[in-house]
Amino acid sequence: MTEDRPKLRLLDIVPVQTQAGQQFLLRDPQRLSPQELVVPTDIAFLLSQFDGSHTIREAQVSYVRRFGSLITTDKIKDLLKRLDEALLLDTERFREFGRRLQAEFRSRPTRAAAHAGQSYEEGAAAFISTWQPRLDAAAPPDDFALDGEHPALIAPHYDMTAAAESYAAAYALLAQAPQPDAAVVLGIGHTGGSAPFTLTRKPFETPFGALETDAEIIDQLAEAAEFDVFADEFLHRDEHSVEFQAVLLHFLYCEREEQPKIVPILCGGYQRQGGELADPGSVGPVSKFLEALRGIIAEDSRRVAVIASADLSHIGARFGQPPPLTQTHLDLARRHDMALLEQVKRGDAEGLYQVFAQDENRYNVCGVPAIYALLRALPIGEGRLLSYKQATEPQTQSCVSFGSVGLR
């Protein structure tokens, strides 16, 4: 990008309904910038021209052709200044800011609780008073227990309040089982990364202190991988998918003398160059890493749990699909989710991938890489669906579905 060819960073651009009609919310999915901007439709179009290849003049011409009116160069430059100050443009200002944040993260002995006080209660007493009644109200099935050496769960990573019932269903079932010594937590790297899997050795801060990581398993995985598992470690800084499970695990065993150590793994998307979906079993570094994970767990004499932190379908305007969101859309998404979950309950990793890929991921299921990794890591015999919900957002005409599954 040059000063005359501005480039917007990769942002979440979410349609929202306001008193002025439909507008667009700009926010940083990496949470490096705390600022959010709401812009009207015409400015959103103008921003789409800021891809590093168009000059300000070319963007101005495209705007005139689209809307039939002139937007002045001064107005465009004022907009670019606001975006740069908000750290939403790919500029040297932003890159320097990012370098400072990465240096700060590397220097910290622990991974800070990025979402405490926002997504969940910051203090231990407040967390317990909120979440213990939720677990008490959950009713784990009488005929399905996680009594094997390697208990496994799928739990959401959606908003912890909106998905509280699903989280509680998963962790109430785990609470009935013998305590694991370690837990592999398979999250989703929502903001990308160069490696298919990203680890960190940093303990996770929670309302109950710092939850230690399992250095033994992490070191074995790092040695077995064909790539640097720490190359994108900074992605862990703000990623919520592992954090939410770490917090709930620490809560579950906070009164025990020892808590399980965790293995935090962020899973990347499975794609070839050109954007085509790729069978992860055919991608050498992915397959070798998962084979190593399976072998490490099998050879470990301790009780090792595996948790996939995964949501299901993402549909509607927020995810690039035209409104309105109808009951038919919800029914089709639910049918697709259930087809995926049938493969999960059978422990069929390849079947899961085939259902996922058959329509080029039309339903934007973000959690498949973590679920697939779980099914490759353990010999699953059967599963039980514990909870399922579709959370709709009327303001954005969108819906995210999630659930919880016990596996053994």
Features from the language model and the residues they span:
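Acidic, low-complexity/disordered tracts enriched in E/D and polar residues
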Residues: 1-49
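Short, charge-rich amphipathic segments
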Residues: 7-18, 98-103, 180, 212-223
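C-terminal functional modules of predominantly eukaryotic multidomain proteins
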Residues: 15, 23-25, 329, 400-408
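Glycine-centered secondary-structure boundary/capping sites
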Residues: 20, 68, 87-89, 205, ...
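Long, charge-rich, low-complexity alpha-helical segments
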Residues: 31-118, 124-125
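Active-site histidine-anchored catalytic micro-motif
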Residues: 109-372, 376-382, 388-397, 406
